């Protein structure tokens, strides 16, 4: 399985993600840059975190209008795997590959801390090494991480099993007081209806080794590699 890690002007988690794939997972990986138009030689495309194009207009808006973004869209339409982390998640919603939008945090502040995530669907390509109800400890770092989707769309996503992670406490209880950004229904990560495109605001690449405080983020990569 060959990975591509996307690099836009302002990306800042690209090397972290590359390191996890190359040195921990020991998989073939290359950087691809914002002017790239051809992703045919890759099996998985990862959009890392950062502040692409300085978050001008709104996070992900300009990145979604690059040649690379069009290539990512075409790649996803072929059923290949696409993962968006933080700013990558924002870009995927701007592209229309994932439902909803990411709005400024409810407190209008940048939030950087460890959070707990509850697995909502263990049957996806990104969670099949996990069990429903498992709790992962993974950090967040964002200003615009408040996931929003209209109520009717949320209902359809629930029915389709598109919600993969929710913010919760250490015991796995989903509560308003542990929601770090005001996301609707405590949502932290979702996938498309087809099941090949996934986005999350927390950073699994920052929870990849015990020395960092957690290796829970590796389970997402291991799930994908078990395909």
From Swiss-Prot:
The keyword Hydrolase applies. SUPFAM superfamilies: Class I glutamine amidotransferase-like. One of its GO terms (biological process) is 'de novo' IMP biosynthetic process. The keyword Hydrolase applies. Pfam families: GATase_5. It is found in: Cytoplasm. One of its GO terms (cellular component) is cytoplasm. It catalyses: N(2)-formyl-N(1)-(5-phospho-beta-D-ribosyl)glycinamide + L-glutamine + ATP + H2O = 2-formamido-N(1)-(5-O-phospho-beta-D-ribosyl)acetamidine + L-glutamate + ADP + phosphate + H(+); L-glutamine + H2O = L-glutamate + NH4(+). This is Phosphoribosylformylglycinamidine synthase subunit PurQ. It comes from Aquifex aeolicus (strain VF5). The gene is purQ.
């Amino acid at each position: 399985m060959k990975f591509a890690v996307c690099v836009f002007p302002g990306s800042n988690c690209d090397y972290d993600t590359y390191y996890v794939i190359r040195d921990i997972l020991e998989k073939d990986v290359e950087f691809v840059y914002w002017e790239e138009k051809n992703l045919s030689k890759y099996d998985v495309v990862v959009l890392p975190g950062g502040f692409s194009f300085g978050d001008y207009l709104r996070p992900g808006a300009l990145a979604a209008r690059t040649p690379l973004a069009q290539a990512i869209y075409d790649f996803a339409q072929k059923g290949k795997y696409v993962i968006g982390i933080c700013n990558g998640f924002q870009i995927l919603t701007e592209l229309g590959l994932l439902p909803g939008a990411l709005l400024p945090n409810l407190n209008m502040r940048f939030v950087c801390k460890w959070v707990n995530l509850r697995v909502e669907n263990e049957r996806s390509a990104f969670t099949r090494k996990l069990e429903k109800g498992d709790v992962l400890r993974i950090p967040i770092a964002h200003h615009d991480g408040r996931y929003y989707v209209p109520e009717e769309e949320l209902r359809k996503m629930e029915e389709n099993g598109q919600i993969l992670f929710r913010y919760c406490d250490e015991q796995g209880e989903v509560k308003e007081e542990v929601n770090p950004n005001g996301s609707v229904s405590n949502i932290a990560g979702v996938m498309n209806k087809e099941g090949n495109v996934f986005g999350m605001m927390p950073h699994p690449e920052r929870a990849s080794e015990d020395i960092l405080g957690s290796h829970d983020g590796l389970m997402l990569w291991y799930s994908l590699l078990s395909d």
